[in-house]
A protein has these predicted regions:
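C-terminal catalytic "cap/lid" subdomain
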Residues: 1-30, 35-63, 67-339
Length: 339
């Protein structure tokens, strides 16, 4: 990372490890429940972790800053933009933001699945060119990574079904696994961001990836590696990046206050390449209570969730307009994300 920073690459590091660091530092006097353990270990471990990063980067003359966040901070546009502004100012002043979930006060029901989910949100929020997810294996395999016959899938195009390949095993101390990594990678790539899953245990992996595989994006990155055959999985980004607002909405499903159920015709139109809004005429049911600007899920005529959007009116107004012609959109196209 120091080499990339010196080459002019702006870096945001999303790092876990606070709980594990704290666990090795302190031994509770009595048995604690899971919530108390997480809060205690993360409080102690985060101080140890950020201090270690501070010392390591100081050896290279690089300042770092700590950013602790929670899932709720992505729920409203105001908090979302406030976080973005904080990290933008840090990057503009040569500071590497080191981001982690604030486990000391996060509510279990609203915690990130793991830091892969958090990294996807950060990459999307900051309009990153590349999201690199480092794991303990070389990428997405076409079988079990433990099977010698399995090979890494090097490129993943849009719409490719990977469900039969993904293993459910988790990394040590982590809350999520390869399924989470794949889901996040696909969503972020659909937003126009290059996503790479690679082995973080490989020496110089970051420099080699950017120098050998993405030279057009990072021409100033130099690598001394002789082996050009890197093994990793590359998620091909959508050719047209989505707007900043749509990126926020795309990751807001967990904060949805209600549901809009739409008919067969509306479902088909939304699945096309047309820029269309959700009109009352195509709505068959409005569930939940929400206000204007709240996030709502979009449910197709078969009951499948197909997207999320920002409501242009309250649930009461949506019910009054439901099924009628000539009414304003309940969700405008500019604030609609279809998966």
């Amino acid at each position: 990372m120091a080499e990339l920073h010196k080459a002019g690459v702006e870096i945001i590091l999303v790092s876990s490890g606070a709980v594990a660091s704290g666990r090795s530092e302190i031994h509770p006097a009595k048995k604690l429940d899971s919530v108390d353990q997480r809060q205690l270990f993360s409080a102690v471990g985060q101080a140890k972790l950020i201090n270690r990063y501070y010392e390591l980067f100081r050896e290279h003359g690089i300042p770092v800053g700590q950013v602790l966040t929670m899932k709720e901070n992505f729920a409203t546009r105001r908090h979302y933009l406030n976080q973005k502004n904080c990290m933008t100012v840090m990057l503009e002043n040569g500071v590497i933001p080191i981001v982690n979930e604030n486990d000391t006060i996060s509510v279990s029901e609203l915690m990130f699945t793991d830091n892969d989910e958090l990294s996807g949100l950060i990459a999307s929020m900051m309009d990153a060119q590349v999201l690199i997810i480092l794991s303990n294996i070389d990428g997405i395999y076409n079988g079990s990574p433990a099977d010698p016959a399995s090979e890494v899938i090097r490129k993943i195009e849009h719409g490719k079904d990977l469900s039969s390949y993904i293993q459910t095993s988790k990394s040590s101390f982590g809350r999520g696994g390869m399924l989470t990594k794949t889901n996040i990678a696909r969503k972020v790539a659909d937003e126009g961001i290059t996503v790479i899953i690679a082995n973080g245990k490989r020496d110089n992996i970051l420099v080699d990836l950017l120098h050998q595989e993405l030279p057009s994006l990072f021409p100033d990155v130099q690598s001394s590696a002789l082996d050009s055959q890197l093994t990793y999985t590359h998620f091909i980004p959508a050719p047209q990046p989505v707007s900043s607002v749509k990126k926020w909405i795309a990751h807001s499903e967990g904060f949805a206050k209600g549901e809009l159920h739409i008919d067969d015709c509306a479902t088909k139109v939304l699945a096309s390449d047309k820029a269309v809004s959700i009109l009352p005429i195509g709505i068959t049911d409005v569930r939940g209570e929400f206000e204007k600007d709240d996030i709502v899920r979009i449910i197709d005529f078969e009951g499948n969730p197909i997207g999320v959007g920002k409501a242009n009116c309250s649930s009461e107004q949506a019910r009054e307009a439901m099924g009628k012609h000539g009414k304003k959109p309940v969700v405008h196209y500019d604030y609609l994300y279809i998966e």
